[in-house]
Amino acid sequence: MNTKYNKEFLLYLAGFVDGDGSIIAQIKPNQSYKFKHQLSLTFQVTQKTQRRWFLDKLVDEIGVGYVRDRGSVSDYILSEIKPLHNFLTQLQPFLKLKQKQANLVLKIIEQLPSAKESPDKFLEVCTWVDQIAALNDSKTRKTTSETVRAVLDSLSEKKKSSP
């Protein structure tokens, strides 16, 4: 789906996202993946649940994503890679506070195919995730590019010691 959004909508949404939105990249441990980690990329807008109607309207207007409730707040979530790339490509020029995060997420998405094949490229992409976390003032992060580096080094050592 390559929806083209109108400029007025993108301008409004960029201001809204700069205030109440998040552009998130995470490294999650996952033993079933080649490098024992997966990357998670998310565009999120949070509102009090009493204003969930606004988030439901975003789902309709953006055409992808979903709304989840977390107690007194609700979140609009977009994490499907192709629609996320399409959406952020159009939104990015209008962002002010979150433009660096959008640029880094777009860069990550564009490098995903090679990052899935090369441990060095995967590690490089993980450093971009670290940069996004720093821009977002992330407080609860457990897995960083250094965590991934240690796992990749361990995997490399196992390969070397195997006959």
UniProtKB/Swiss-Prot annotation:
GO biological process, one term: intron homing
Effect of K139M: Reduced affinity for DNA. No effect on catalytic activity. Reduced cleavage
Source species: Chlamydomonas reinhardtii (Chlamydomonas smithii)
Keywords on record: Chloroplast, Endonuclease, Hydrolase, Intron homing, Magnesium, Metal-binding, Nuclease, Plastid
Residues the record lists as binding Mg(2+) 1: G19, D20
Annotated family: Belongs to the LAGLIDADG endonuclease family.
Upper classification of the organism: Eukaryota, Viridiplantae, Chlorophyta, core chlorophytes, Chlorophyceae
Enzyme Commission number: 3.1.-.-
Designated name of the protein: DNA endonuclease I-CreI
